[in-house]
């Protein structure tokens, strides 16, 4: 399991319940996402609660004997008898589930899903990281009998659940729906709470470290371990080290405030055209979130996507913070305390942009941004994110402070006025609506 010590409630559980009741064994469930986000844990917890029995086959540490069973599945009766004997678990028809954990490590097990699902005796749940699932599935017949579900780091609501707080998010939801400010005292506490989420992040290991130690250095070490694991995985994407270089440069790239990721700054003499396949693989791995420039933003943002212009974010903002201080042997508690108390240095203001990207992706939105050149052409106005909103679009400008200037938003709205549903400025002050603009505190982004 990815997180042995503790189980955290996750929203994906309800998605899994829906799959079980609606598909009734007609498909396997494939939970895909980055490493260390809790895929194995949720699969096992679901199996334990929702089935009479289950077998967990962890292909990262399975014996050659078990792995070899899937090289020849011509006799399913024999396969099931062997699995029951090896794991000492009795399987019950339509009441048991078999979990293929880290299924990418045994491609023939994934290929077998077609026949196992057709057999219909048991349910099947697969977990895998996209880095490996893509790279290791090229020589097999990928089954169509899969229901794929993306899993992300713990979102803010899941983080609050882990801390034993089930009341904050309903309050925020009601306030947002009623367009109500919460008042200075409440707002200050909510901002401090959200900054804590930004610092710890949503990786279960980091959250567990925070809960059990209340020590940011322990949290930071947990995050450094995850980053090291990701960087090792990036070698599977590109053994020249370019993926690792692109990832490590994310904080520096965002701090430059350039209109796109400057590949040549991260990798000397490299060009976007030569690196896009690596960027795509990184995006597919779900270790990063990538926002693409929309050249003519309108309904159907993907139709105007310019892949030569992109920005890259870490999939988890807690990892972003650790990545920003990676040169330090360990990020000291005092640094975290300063960040928690809103003493961000200027170049770390982009942690807010990263967390907005993370929140938008977790709510199922693809990431797009837009730039408009100044009249003199040397500078540009930038809308950080553009999201679909019913039959129109809504621009989002992000401020890492309470600063309410919104020239970019004004320029965008003037140019595309007939396409716009709502105008959002996300910042660090209380909610307000003024002159057609919604000023949304960062902790309410999930409701957009």
PLM feature segments, named:
Residues 2-6, 11, 20-27, 36, ...:
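A cross-kingdom feature that marks ATP-driven nucleic-acid transaction machinery
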Residues 115, 132-148, 160-165:
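Short regulatory helix/loop adjacent to the ATP-binding pocket of P-loop NTPases
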Residues 31:
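Hydrophobic anchor at the beta1->P-loop junction of P-loop NTPases
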Residues 99, 123-129, 150:
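Structural recognition of the conserved hydrophobic beta-strand(s) that form the central parallel beta-sheet
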Residues 48-65:
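Conserved catalytic segments around the Walker B and adjacent sensor/switch elements
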Residues 61-94:
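Short glycine-rich substrate-engagement loop in P-loop NTPases that contacts/grips substrate
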Residues 39:
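Conserved lysine of the Walker
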């Amino acid at each position: 399991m990815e997180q042995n010590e503790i189980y955290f409630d996750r929203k994906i559980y309800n998605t899994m319940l829906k799959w079980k009741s609606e598909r009734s064994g007609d498909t396997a469930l494939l939970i895909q996402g980055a490493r260390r986000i809790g895929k194995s844990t949720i699969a096992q917890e679901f199996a334990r609660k929702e089935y009479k029995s289950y077998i967990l086959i962890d292909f990262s540490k399975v014996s050659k004997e078990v792995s070899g069973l899937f090289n020849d599945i011509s006799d399913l009766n024999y396969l099931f008898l062997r699995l029951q004997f090896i794991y000492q678990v009795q399987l019950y028809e339509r009441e048991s589930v078999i979990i293929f954990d880290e299924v990418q490590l045994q491609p023939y097990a994934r290929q077998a899903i077609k026949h196992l699902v057709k057999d219909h005796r048991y349910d099947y749940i697969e977990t895998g990281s996209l880095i490996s699932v893509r790279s290791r599935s090229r020589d097999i017949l990928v089954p169509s009998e899969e229901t794929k579900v993306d899993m992300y780091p713990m979102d803010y609501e899941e983080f609050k659940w882990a801390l034993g707080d089930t009341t904050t998010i309903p309050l925020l939801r009601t306030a947002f729906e009623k367009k109500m400010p919460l008042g200075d005292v409440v707002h200050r506490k909510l901002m401090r709470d959200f900054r804590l989420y930004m610092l710890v992040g949503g990786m279960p290991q980091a959250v567990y470290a925070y809960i059990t130690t209340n020590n940011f250095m322990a949290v930071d070490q947990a995050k450094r371990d995850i980053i090291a694991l990701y960087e090792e995985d990036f070698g599977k994407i590109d053994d020249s080290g370019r993926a690792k270089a692109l990832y490590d440069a994310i904080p520096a790239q965002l701090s430059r405030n350039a209109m796109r990721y400057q590949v040549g700054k991260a990798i000397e003499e490299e060009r976007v055209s030569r690196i896009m396949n690596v960027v795509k693989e990184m995006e597919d791995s779900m270790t990063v979130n990538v926002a693409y420039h929309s050249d003519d933003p309108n309904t159907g943002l993907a139709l105007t996507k310019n892949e030569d212009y992109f920005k890259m974010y870490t999939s988890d903002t807690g990892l972003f913070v650790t990545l920003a201080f990676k040169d330090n042997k360990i990020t000291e508690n005092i640094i975290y305390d300063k960040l928690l108390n809103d003493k961000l240095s200027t170049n770390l203001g982009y942690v807010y942009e990263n967390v907005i990207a993370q929140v938008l992706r977790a709510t199922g939105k693809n990431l797009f941004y837009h730039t408009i050149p100044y009249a003199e052409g040397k500078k540009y106005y930038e809308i950080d994110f553009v999201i679909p909103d019913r039959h129109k679009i809504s621009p989002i400008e992000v401020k890492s402070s309470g600063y309410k200037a919104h020239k970019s938003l004004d320029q965008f709205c003037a140019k595309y006025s007939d396409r716009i549903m709502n105008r959002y400025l996300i910042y660090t002050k209380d909610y307000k609506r003024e002159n057609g603009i919604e000023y949304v505190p960062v902790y309410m982004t999930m409701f957009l």
